[in-house]
A protein has these predicted regions:
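Boundary at the C-terminal end of the N-terminal hydrophobic targeting segment
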Residues: 21-24
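Bacterial N-terminal signal peptides
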Residues: 7-18
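Extracellular polysaccharide-degrading/modifying enzymes targeting complex plant/algal/animal polysaccharides
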Residues: 28-355, 361, 376, 581-595, ...
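Surface-exposed extracellular loop regions of Gram-negative outer-membrane beta-barrel proteins
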Residues: 360-366, 523-527
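Positively charged n-region of N-terminal signal peptides that target proteins for export
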Residues: 1-7
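Glycine- and acidic/polar-rich repeat regions and solenoidal domains
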Residues: 81, 349-353, 371-378, 391-663, ...
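Beta-strand repeat scaffolds of extracellular/surface proteins
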Residues: 32, 72-74, 87, 100-103, ...
Length: 728
């Protein structure tokens, strides 16, 4: 696939979307609109749904002239979400455009607005007794039934991704569900494990603090749940507490948490996991733990939202309480639809979802405060997600899939110039997810997706995670990832043996000491990682047992390990008989067209038969500066299939234009690159966000946070994981 520079791609996008000037039909929508309105500027429709119905009634000739839906300022409440289907599609010359009226700031939200008069005093004596003494008189209650929220149910005995009962928002901030310990990364740890749990038993652990003594009333009401990293530091699950023994200092669950409790890295002689004292957990949704303004909890029995209102609540700035899990705006098999310049927030589902269709555009939007994904693209062709700000999501900021791997038909999607931050707040998913799927959704196959010029930062999990093949990742900046998880990467590939054609070039990954900059995990093969800069990451490159991966002409600075390639495929039996790896290979027929022509290495790998030992990998021309271990390869007998040459460990900050301020442009005439034959220039100034039609300026990075912030809150050792797994 031919790839074009970023400005040209945007120009193509703008041509496809077209200009508003030619649109002959304008439909105005206002929160104050009336049912039966005409949709004129003076008689606006009450909702986008009404606008969609009006579009369906237009004649083909009217649609052919183009349609624009213009939203007035204010909160557009979408309690059930809105679906734009194929009957509303535009064309390549005149798309359907959904945008704001000139000068207006509309907000699409699934949140019921709640202001002062709906915040009632807590009168139930048993509830008041449960509140912290400092919170009594400050906590208010909201009767959910008065908001029309009637289907809310308690958490199950074990839960993972889709767990949040409500999304509660004020302004641009998601208000936190009550927890102990406080803080978005507030956790305590287990002291030890007395029972790992089984199919018939939930497991028991010893707690450290006497805080659980306060939770006896919640326990008596069967409304006590904990969330924790019970077994490994990259999977968080919730579990309902069955009992607390305050004499023994133990907590017992109703039901077994997947894999049991207790770190998998510490086993006794009998194979029982006694725990290593680092397993992190917290209590959630307890009235007893509402002790700060903004915190809230749901009383499932009484159908009440208990909240300590923060300052600033008013009719103009209400608390938004969202309970609907449908996407706020869904393009369902629609094509040539442009959603531009809108603010979308407050949902238990996705903010915006594209299902099938072709050539849709989401551009210049401000998307936040949703419990699932900001923008989800599920199939279709040539969709573009351009220059959006996406933050405060429970799962991924952007997720996309499409294309057909067996035929190498590309999706053609483009994810360009987006600022994605503070994702994975509720469950461990990457900021940008290409294919694979996860806790929030199953995305499916992904082929031929272009991810460029994005800024990904301050996220609990991975930066960009991908499956599939033939993707291009270039000019992205990724930093401060893995703030609440482990075993992840700035770029994390989970593609198996069929991951050929994935290119990562000219990216900058930095300040992520709990993540590896480029991580090709569990047999991922066929990737090209070239011309990238990794600074202050756990590892610059980590390859786990893959083949035909090329790590060439990268710069690694201040990483404890520069480049690590291992042979885990031997101990983990990465053979063609493996259901995951072998089944994936069979699904693409590597000895037939188009695979045999485009990616002949896969057919060669299969023909050779031996797939447990690394084959065809290269480590060439890399610069490693101040890395504790520069290059780490398997034992010589297993490293014969890895080509290593021309790598250097010399160099200093003086070789770069402004290393102190993280500008790693190599100075002209530097001896650093001259020492490596064929080292291509890295266009460092082109990395990251760019000014375009939708993004008028580039937000500054928080330099103080970069210099002083902690990125090891959930410290994870890839080396420990490799060693432990290889002993199986």
């Amino acid at each position: 696939m031919v790839k074009f520079p970023f400005p040209l791609l945007l120009a193509i996008a703008f041509i496809k979307i077209g200009a508003l000037a030619s649109a002959s039909v304008e439909l105005h929508v206002s929160p104050s609109g009336k049912t039966g309105a005409t949709g004129s500027a003076t008689d606006p429709l009450p909702s986008i749904k009404d606008a969609a119905n009006s579009i369906k009634s237009l004649s083909p000739d009217q649609k052919a002239q183009g349609v624009t839906v213009l939203l007035a300022g204010g909160f557009h409440f979408l309690p059930e979400g809105v679906v734009i289907d194929s009957s509303c599609s535009g064309t390549s010359n005149v798309p359907l455009v959904i945008t704001a009226e000139q000068g207006a700031s509309p907000v699409l939200t699934g949140g019921h607005p709640v202001s002062g008069d709906q915040l009632e005093t807590v009168k139930d004596a048993s509830l008041l007794e449960r509140l912290d003494t400092n919170a009594r008189g400050k906590v208010r209650q909201i009767d959910l039934s008065k908001l029309g929220i009637t289907g809310i149910t308690p958490f199950p005995q074990v839960f993972s991704g889709d767990w949040r009962p409500l999304q509660v928002v004020l302004g641009t901030n998601s208000l936190p569900i009550s927890r102990w310990p406080n803080g978005e990364y507030g956790f305590t740890t287990m002291k030890s494990v007395t029972d790992n749990g089984s199919a018939t038993n939930g497991g028991t652990f010893v707690y450290r603090d006497d805080r659980p003594v306060r939770w006896q009333k919640a326990l008596a009401d069967n409304e006590l749940w904990l969330r924790g990293f019970w077994r490994v530091p990259w999977v968080i699950n919730g579990a309902q507490v069955k009992s607390i023994d305050t004499n023994a200092g133990t907590i017992t669950f109703f039901k077994d948490v997947g894999g049991g409790i207790g770190s998998k890295y510490k086993k006794d002689a009998q194979g029982r996991r006694s725990g290593d004292g680092t397993e992190a957990w917290c209590a959630v949704n307890l009235p007893e733990e509402i002790d700060e303004p903004g915190e809230w909890a749901v009383d499932f029995k009484r159908k009440l939202l208990l909240i300590w209102p923060p300052e600033g609540v008013s009719a103009q700035n209400p608390i938004l309480v969202a309970a609907n899990k449908d996407p706020l705006l869904a393009l369902d098999n629609a094509s040539y639809v442009a959603v531009k310049g809108l603010r979308i927030l407050g949902s238990l589902g996705d903010a915006l979802q594209i299902r099938s269709g072709e050539n849709n555009l989401v551009a210049g939007c401000d998307i936040s405060n949703v419990a699932q994904t900001g923008v989800s693209v599920r199939g279709g062709k040539n969709h573009r997600i351009v220059s959006n700000d996406i933050r405060e999501t429970g799962g991924s900021g952007i997720a996309a899939a499409g294309g057909v791997k067996a035929t190498l038909e590309p999706a053609g999607h483009e994810i360009l110039n987006n600022d994605v931050s503070r994702s994975a707040n509720d469950f461990p998913e990457p900021a940008i997810q290409i294919g694979i799927g996860g806790a929030s959704q199953i995305l499916g196959s992904a082929v031929g997706i272009h991810v460029s010029h994005n800024r990904v930062h301050d996220t609990a999990n991975a930066g960009i995670r991908f499956g599939g093949c033939d993707h291009l990742f270039e000019f992205n900046e990724v930093y401060r990832i893995g703030l609440n998880s482990g075993d992840l990467g700035g770029f994390y590939g989970y593609c198996g043996f069929t991951g050929f054609g994935n290119v990562m070039r000219n990216n900058f990954v930095h300040h992520s000491m709990n993540g590896n900059a480029f991580y090709m995990d569990d047999g991922t093969s066929g990737a090209l990682v070239t011309g990238n800069v990794a600074y202050k990451c756990a590892m610059g490159v980590l390859m786990g047992g893959g083949h035909y991966n090329r790590f060439e002409y990268n710069i690694m600075i201040d990483c404890p390990k520069g480049i690590h390639l291992d042979d885990r495929g031997i101990s983990r039996k990465y053979t063609l008989e493996d259901k995951r790896l072998g089944g994936d290979v069979q699904s693409v027929s590597p000895d037939q067209s188009p695979w045999k022509e485009k990616h002949p290495e896969l057919a060669a790998l299969v023909a050779g038969g031996e797939t447990t030992i690394p084959k065809g990998d290269t480590v060439i021309g890399n610069v490693l500066i101040n890395c504790g271990t520069s290059i780490e390869l398997p034992k010589p007998e297993y490293a014969a299939g890895i080509e290593q040459k021309g790598n250097i460990t010399t160099g200093s900050p003086a070789d770069f234009v402004d290393a102190d301020n993280f500008d790693f442009t190599v100075k002209p005439g530097s001896t650093l690159v001259a020492a490596i034959e064929g080292f291509p220039p890295i266009p460092f100034q082109q990395i990251g966000l760019q000014v375009d039609e939708y993004r008028k300026s580039i937000p500054q990075r928080d330099m103080k946070l970069l210099r002083e912030g902690d990125t090891t809150k959930r410290k994870f050792s890839s080396t420990t994981d490799i060693e432990a797994s290889n002993k199986k």
